[in-house]
């Protein structure tokens, strides 16, 4: 993953960036802790390198002397002791994972002979040239092997190679350094050949699997950075969701307000309100669309971060590696001086084969078969190694080349001696371990036995690496299935959310269309009512106009009649007196008739109540008869009453 892709997550500006600052602060603290741990590991490696430097300088001097001198050095130790060597050995004793074997080595090597500091590799070559028949490893090929093996190792291997260094010291302790004589030398050569084969096979295997290591360095996610990035993205997704909800609520409010205003507005105001509403609606729709696109972008980023994670920044990794290689190279200069000078005999041929195999990991893996066939004379088990190396070359050759170019161009040294000190720890350990005992000559039989045993160890290492690779593939497949399940679940959830959002959008569109249709219907009804009212008012005005015209016609007729009557009256002025008398007579007759009618009505009003029932009728008739009787005999009755009421005489 490119650094721009890992840093892009933190380049987005956040308005409320307090949480982001806190995360950045925690990230810097974690990086400082990692740098401290790396520095401590580098110091431990430097201590181990210093101890190995003095150790292998002493063993190199011992391998250059005769067995008689070895016995004399062991029997007659010098009283002077190098304090630096003792301190380094004491520190190695505290750091190494095998203190008992190292204590045996330190007890055997108590009085190292003094060496002149400052003697370069070229001067030593001049002093001790190899025999004519023994091939030596070219310095360039040794550097290429170191670069290839270094490319197969993780970038953090310079800070975590304490077990490798301890294994090298264990090999040195198991080699029987203090055994004098020819037999001890042959035994040391055999053991060192076996251990060198194992170490070289592990180096070749690591270079074969260089793609896995480089990918693990480039692809190992930093948990703290990944966690912070996921939290940051989730916070942004929540903010965008809230903004989308707010925008949708504002759009609904605008629709409700438009409907409310459209109901209580006339035509001109309704058109103006409609224009304003359409502008606001388009703007809110664009805003919601942009927020949804941004939300999908952050969801995609979150999926990528959850799947791939955020690795360490390559700048920091290469800076730490460069510093670590500088320190280790400066401390293990003497350790690397003995690599090229002391590799002789049968081990030199195997080192050349190892170099060819390591170079073939990147370019030509089939050369391994021909080289090992020429060197060892047997090609029974070569296809297994060739297949494993071909797989590493086909899958990850380009990545191994990239790492080789990085590590070859990273350390910058002023001389060839400094450059040789920055090679890989495993190759240097193997070559130096081989250089401890190659000083003495060995027979062809021992060489063939050692080569066959070394080849068996190499095949055993290749088999173990294959098993490890199979386990890694199983773990990778399990992890891949887990991430595929998570990815499918997230995609299903995303599809459901997208489907739900689409349904909501469709419902909202339907509701908006319904409101618009209702508004259009209301407008049509208002227009029809307006037309109806206008028609009714026109009809009423026409009726009123017709009535007024009829009244005017009648008035004009009455005026004409009055005029005609006036004309007639003017013509009948001669008979006016007769007409006046006739009128007065008629008036008198009418008055008499009115009096009679009043009398009759009065009598009727008086008689009618007396005639309503049968009893009243009989009573009324009796009363009338009585009155008539009194009226008829009134004189007699009056005299009788007068006599009755007169006083006596």
UniProtKB/Swiss-Prot annotation:
<dbReference type="GO" id="GO:0005789">
    <property type="term" value="C:endoplasmic reticulum membrane"/>
</dbReference>
<feature type="modified residue" description="Phosphoserine">
    <location>
        <position position="410"/>
    </location>
</feature>
<comment type="function">
    <text>Endoplasmic reticulum membrane protein that promotes endoplasmic reticulum-associated endosome fission. Localizes to contact sites between the endoplasmic reticulum and endosomes and acts by promoting recruitment of the endoplasmic reticulum to endosome tubules for fission. Endosome membrane fission of early and late endosomes is essential to separate regions destined for lysosomal degradation from carriers to be recycled to the plasma membrane.</text>
</comment>
<feature type="compositionally biased region" description="Low complexity">
    <location>
        <begin position="156"/>
        <end position="166"/>
    </location>
</feature>
<feature type="transmembrane region" description="Helical">
    <location>
        <begin position="588"/>
        <end position="608"/>
    </location>
</feature>
<feature type="modified residue" description="N-acetylmethionine">
    <location>
        <position position="1"/>
    </location>
</feature>
<keyword id="KW-0813">Transport</keyword>
<dbReference type="GO" id="GO:0016197">
    <property type="term" value="P:endosomal transport"/>
</dbReference>
<dbReference type="GO" id="GO:0140285">
    <property type="term" value="P:endosome fission"/>
</dbReference>
<feature type="coiled-coil region">
    <location>
        <begin position="224"/>
        <end position="310"/>
    </location>
</feature>
<feature type="compositionally biased region" description="Polar residues">
    <location>
        <begin position="197"/>
        <end position="214"/>
    </location>
</feature>
<keyword id="KW-0472">Membrane</keyword>
<dbReference type="GO" id="GO:0005791">
    <property type="term" value="C:rough endoplasmic reticulum"/>
</dbReference>
<keyword id="KW-1133">Transmembrane helix</keyword>
<dbReference type="InterPro" id="IPR019394">
    <property type="entry name" value="TEX28/TMCC"/>
</dbReference>
<feature type="region of interest" description="Disordered">
    <location>
        <begin position="197"/>
        <end position="222"/>
    </location>
</feature>
<feature type="compositionally biased region" description="Basic and acidic residues">
    <location>
        <begin position="20"/>
        <end position="34"/>
    </location>
</feature>
<keyword id="KW-0007">Acetylation</keyword>
<keyword id="KW-0256">Endoplasmic reticulum</keyword>
<feature type="topological domain" description="Cytoplasmic">
    <location>
        <begin position="1"/>
        <end position="587"/>
    </location>
</feature>
<dbReference type="GO" id="GO:0005829">
    <property type="term" value="C:cytosol"/>
</dbReference>
<feature type="coiled-coil region">
    <location>
        <begin position="457"/>
        <end position="566"/>
    </location>
</feature>
<dbReference type="GO" id="GO:0090148">
    <property type="term" value="P:membrane fission"/>
</dbReference>
<feature type="compositionally biased region" description="Polar residues">
    <location>
        <begin position="64"/>
        <end position="75"/>
    </location>
</feature>
<feature type="region of interest" description="Disordered">
    <location>
        <begin position="411"/>
        <end position="433"/>
    </location>
</feature>
<dbReference type="GO" id="GO:0097750">
    <property type="term" value="P:endosome membrane tubulation"/>
</dbReference>
<feature type="topological domain" description="Cytoplasmic">
    <location>
        <begin position="642"/>
        <end position="649"/>
    </location>
</feature>
<keyword id="KW-0812">Transmembrane</keyword>
<dbReference type="Pfam" id="PF10267">
    <property type="entry name" value="Tmemb_cc2"/>
</dbReference>
<feature type="region of interest" description="Disordered">
    <location>
        <begin position="1"/>
        <end position="37"/>
    </location>
</feature>
<dbReference type="GO" id="GO:0007029">
    <property type="term" value="P:endoplasmic reticulum organization"/>
</dbReference>
<keyword id="KW-0597">Phosphoprotein</keyword>
<dbReference type="GO" id="GO:0042802">
    <property type="term" value="F:identical protein binding"/>
</dbReference>
<feature type="modified residue" description="Phosphoserine">
    <location>
        <position position="378"/>
    </location>
</feature>
<feature type="compositionally biased region" description="Basic residues">
    <location>
        <begin position="113"/>
        <end position="125"/>
    </location>
</feature>
<feature type="region of interest" description="Disordered">
    <location>
        <begin position="110"/>
        <end position="166"/>
    </location>
</feature>
<feature type="transmembrane region" description="Helical">
    <location>
        <begin position="621"/>
        <end position="641"/>
    </location>
</feature>
<dbReference type="GO" id="GO:0140284">
    <property type="term" value="C:endoplasmic reticulum-endosome membrane contact site"/>
</dbReference>
<protein>
    <recommendedName>
        <fullName>Transmembrane and coiled-coil domains protein 1</fullName>
    </recommendedName>
</protein>
<feature type="region of interest" description="Disordered">
    <location>
        <begin position="58"/>
        <end position="83"/>
    </location>
</feature>
<comment type="subunit">
    <text>May form homodimers and heterodimers with TMCC2 or TMCC3 via the coiled-coil domains. Interacts with ribosomal proteins RPL4 and RPS6.</text>
</comment>
<feature type="compositionally biased region" description="Polar residues">
    <location>
        <begin position="420"/>
        <end position="433"/>
    </location>
</feature>
